[in-house]
């Protein structure tokens, strides 16, 4: 017969393993290939071509909406390089712009650059999804912070793209951006 002192230890160890399992499974990386069978299939050459209009919100890490914005985008391709000229207007009346250069480097692989992006952005498509990661110089008040962006874009129909961007700094979540882009005629 085992002493009774071991029974609580067994329960504690079981609880420890259950918690450890959930912690490990919650850290499982979101994979682009999960979406490879989803339709409609995204084709960046087709969607990012012509005029687009986007509306979005920025949320802080608690989920509070801290900014709303509209973006007018003019997109074009020359060979395997896209130019996305973005003009932002925020709910407080402020404005900004960004010009992305996207380069197709493989069947489903892309690289991107922009004036406020550190280094090279990396992207990949599968099914209806486009996964895009980069470090952005983000102005906040009188300072600029380098923030990691992890964009997940999903083609909803031939004219609509839904985007969720997760922002982090030193591995900690700092906010999210939700955006809907529509092609204009």
Residue ranges and their predicted role:
Residues 150-185:
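Glycine-rich, aromatic-bearing surface loops/beta-hairpins
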Residues 23-26:
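C-terminal motif of bacterial Sec signal peptides marking the signal peptidase cleavage site
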Residues 55, 59-140, 152:
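Central antiparallel beta-sheet cores of small beta-barrel/beta-sandwich binding domains
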Residues 10-19:
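Sec-dependent signal peptide recognition
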Residues 35-51:
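N-terminal helix-cap/turn-to-beta initiation motif at the start of protein domains
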Residues 48-56, 163:
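A short, Trp-centered hydrophobic/proline-enriched beta-strand micro-motif
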Residues 1-11:
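N-terminal secretory signal peptides that target proteins for export/translocation
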Residues 28-30:
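Bacterial signal peptide processing site
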């Amino acid at each position: 017969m085992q002493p009774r002192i071991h029974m609580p230890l067994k329960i504690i160890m079981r609880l420890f393993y259950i918690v450890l399992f959930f912690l490990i499974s919650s850290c499982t990386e979101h994979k682009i290939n999960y979406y490879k069978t989803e339709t409609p299939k995204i084709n960046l050459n087709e969607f990012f071509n012509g005029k687009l209009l986007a509306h979005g919100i920025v949320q802080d890490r608690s989920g509070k909406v801290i900014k709303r914005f509209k973006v007018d985008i003019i997109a074009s391709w020359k060979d395997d390089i896209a130019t996305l000229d973005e003009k932002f207007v925020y709910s407080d009346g402020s404005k900004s712009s960004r010009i992305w250069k996207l380069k197709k480097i493989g069947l489903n692989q892309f690289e991107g650059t922009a004036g406020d992006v550190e280094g090279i952005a990396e992207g990949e498509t599968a099914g209806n999804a486009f996964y895009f990661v980069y470090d952005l110089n983000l102005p906040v008040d009188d300072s600029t912070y380098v923030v990691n962006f992890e964009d997940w874009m999903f083609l909803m129909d031939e004219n609509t793209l839904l985007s969720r961007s997760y922002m982090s700094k030193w591995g900690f979540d700092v906010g999210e951006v939700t955006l809907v882009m529509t092609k204009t005629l």
